[in-house]
Amino acid sequence: MPVAQGDLDATSNAEFYNPHGVLGGHLGIGKHADTATIRVLRPLAKSVTILTQDGEYPMTHEYNGVFVVTVPASGTKKQPTIPDYRVRTEWESGAVLIEDDPYRYMPTVGDMDTYLFGEGRHEKLWETLGAHVLRYDDPMGGADGTPGEQVVGTAFSVWAPNAHAVRVVGNFNAWDGRRHAMRELGSSGVWEIFIPGIGAGETYKFQILNANYTWEMKADPMERQHEVPPSTASIVTESTYKWNDDAWMQHRRTTNPHDGPVSIYEVHAGSWKQGLTYRDLAKQLVDYVKQEGFTHVEFMPLAQHPFSGSWGYQVTGYYAVDSRLGSPDDFRYLVDQFHQAGIGVIMDWVPAHFPKDAFALGRFDGTPLYEDPDPLRGEHPEWGTYVFNFGRREVRNFLVANALFWLEDLHVDALRVDAVSSMLYLDYSREPGHWRPNIYGGRENLEAIDFLKEATATAYKNNPGVMVIAEESTAWPGITAPTSAGGIGFGMKWNMGWMHDTLEYLHEEPINRKWHHNEITFSMVYAYSEHYVLPISHDEVVYGKGSLYGKMPGDDWQKLAGVRSMFAYQWAHPGKKLSFMGNELAQWGEWDHDASIDWDCLNWQEHRQVQTMVADLNAFYKAHPALWSQDFDPAGFQWLTSDDADHNTLSFLRIGTKGETLAVVVNFSGEAWSDYQVALPTGGKWTEVFTTDDAKYGGSDIHNGTFEAVEGEYHSRPFSAKITVPALGVVFLKPED
């Protein structure tokens, strides 16, 4: 079967878009229909022989490293087929190698896969693109001809629509891509090859002849494992993990977490305790989070990122977990252990932007492929990163499928989406004249809005029981409204206003707080405009902002009491809860990603007592639906007294869906108030059921026990009682059933 000289020349240089059309086996036509012509590329080989079940066929050097031979076809006269074969190569050194031929295999990516990807609708993209270990039964045995074995190999595929040629390189071909040129699948822009003999653990990259006719090495955008930085190659991986969280996943599918208790322990995995792996964390961190009573753990990004100083927020491998801490199956084990302990796992997800590292996504095929081609939209001036092209179907598919990958393949229970504000606004962090309006002349990023709606809607549709949470700092309306009602579709968003006002207020000396009382009450004006998470996150205890302990004024006792009252006020306020690691210890110093949190402070009893209070507060919180069952419904909250600025005190009711009621009294002054009159909705006996001032928490041990609410209108309530409210303390009161 003759081949055009131009195609042969391009194939010999591994620069042909369809090497499978030249190399491998091809049936003859006409009177030669009972034969097959086989070509292989073996530059510098001394001799090459084709081995079939019927015999050995020495090949002839045809052109520039291309060898050719014609052999008898298999099958029948009416339906001839290419015979199974292996290639024996003898090199000038005398070494002899028997191996299978990548170019005898059909495409491993189907037409439906490329169609769905082109339409932006392939919801299992990670099962198609990237590197996948496959096994085939073959009468000639394994890839090296070993009888009785399966052919084990890896299917590689990558999207590079503007590339002129793509090769796979790795240790298996001495990083010489001429042996493994890929074929382009029609007009899809997807390149593919199956390479027999390659299994899990092999490192690889794609060598791309880009739009500028320059060869570049790129890591796989769909890699599911990556070398430990600073190395930059992808790794073929095959999961052998057997999940043991069926009960958790079944419960997840049948439960709405938005209506349940959510208290989140935010963690930077590399610095909670330095030097731990995913397997180590599966013991130590799981036990600790369970001990402290949090319902969920939230990890700062654990997708692959080259620069540890980015804290994970500059991602290069969206489908790979951070290799510094272990393998993908090690990460699965960590998630599994959390689930078996009854703890949900939240992952920070960064679809807004990506770094410019040359080995990664940027200018992937020599053009702005993943990033927006408009420089006024495609680069983030503040972070020095590229912004995704949210208007391109394949890019949106890459990101939406990635969200599903974390939720489905890795069993993560929720995504916290980073930097949503930067996606919503075209002028975000840009000077006048350095941004381009949308088609209507506005500042809204219409393509990003559509992407976010698609991502949230798809996540919730495909995975009942998950949460998708926005880190969004503006007043954009409808962030947590359903897409069917014109909203963005998030389940919750961080309440940055509450966080800012609360920390500003608590930073004031108690004697000055009366002049700032509006800061601590203002959050209830808009508390139900969205579904909120109340965050005291990593961003508030870094870059000179000080630790939570350090933000509190006063002496050591007052600082610790301030931390305790801060936690209790946060846990009592409508909205789900989030606190960063170290806050529960009242650690002295602010967070440093290059060091562990201040575990040494637990050598002091006072800090152990704060840690104990947080554990007890979480247990109390989970046991009382009044504190969580109506977080997003105004019926779950009523003010008792909001205007007692002179005493730095506020009181309110939390009410559950089944009528459970708790009264909460918060004293942010430095003095205890005896005979403090509290308005109450019902008479009879009330009992103090939790106080931050208990001696076991390091408090002054003021208690109110059980007392009687007496009739008589006070602050528009029919009953009231006089209690003692501890300095810098919070008390929870419950009526007798």
Curated annotation (Swiss-Prot):
Gene3D superfamilies: Glycosidases (3.20.20.80), Golgi alpha-mannosidase II (2.60.40.1180), Immunoglobulins (2.60.40.10). Its EC number is 2.4.1.18. One of its GO terms (biological process) is glycogen biosynthetic process. This is 1,4-alpha-glucan branching enzyme GlgB. The keyword Glycosyltransferase applies. Keywords: Carbohydrate metabolism, Glycogen biosynthesis, Glycogen metabolism, Glycosyltransferase, Transferase. It holds the Pfam family Alpha-amylase_C. Pathway: Glycan biosynthesis; glycogen biosynthesis.
